[in-house]
């Protein structure tokens, strides 16, 4: 997945940086919240149940409040698109880790480590170009 952002208009919400659409942001937040509610680790079956509930429109975004005007808001998201556009990119970026032996998904801090690594790669590139002299004209 490619993340493009503007340093001067960087959103406060990480999900706005990572995902292209508002619906993807909501589903990504729902997934992380679901995982955190279950000890930051869920099994393959639990992930499938989560995706199926989304697909069937049974996932609740906003629970019904005490006010008569508060409505329970349910959301629907295609199961295949959930795996293609939410889970697979989150695994690829290191936000979620999959343990092949335990067959569990776990919230990971690899994303942070990768962003630090990308920053260090950029600094090395700048230093390399300084040593070689000014960048050659094309």
Segments (PLM) and residue ranges:
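Long, low-complexity, charged/polar intrinsically disordered regions in eukaryotic proteins
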Residues: 1-40
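Minor-groove-contacting beta-hairpin "wing" of winged helix-turn-helix DNA-binding domains
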Residues: 102-109
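DNA-recognition alpha helix
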Residues: 43-71
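Short, amphipathic alpha-helical interaction segments positioned at domain boundaries
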Residues: 110-138
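Short amphipathic alpha-helical interaction segments
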Residues: 73-93
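Long, compositionally biased intrinsically disordered regions
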Residues: 35-38, 44-51, 137-138
């Amino acid at each position: 997945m490619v993340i493009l952002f503007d340093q001067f208009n960087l959103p406060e919400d990480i999900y706005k940086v990572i995902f292209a659409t508002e619906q993807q942001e909501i589903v990504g937040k729902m997934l992380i919240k679901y995982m955190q509610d279950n000890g930051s680790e869920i099994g393959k079956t639990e992930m499938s149940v989560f995706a199926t509930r989304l697909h069937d429109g049974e996932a609740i975004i906003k629970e019904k409040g005490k006010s008569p005007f508060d409505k329970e808001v349910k959301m629907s998201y295609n199961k295949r698109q959930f795996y293609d556009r939410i889970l697979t990119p989150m695994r690829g970026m290191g936000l979620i880790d999959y343990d092949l032996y335990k067959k569990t998904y776990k919230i990971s801090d690899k994303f942070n480590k990768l962003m630090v690594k990308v920053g260090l790669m950029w600094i090395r590139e700048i230093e390399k170009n300084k040593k070689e002299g000014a960048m050659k004209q094309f």
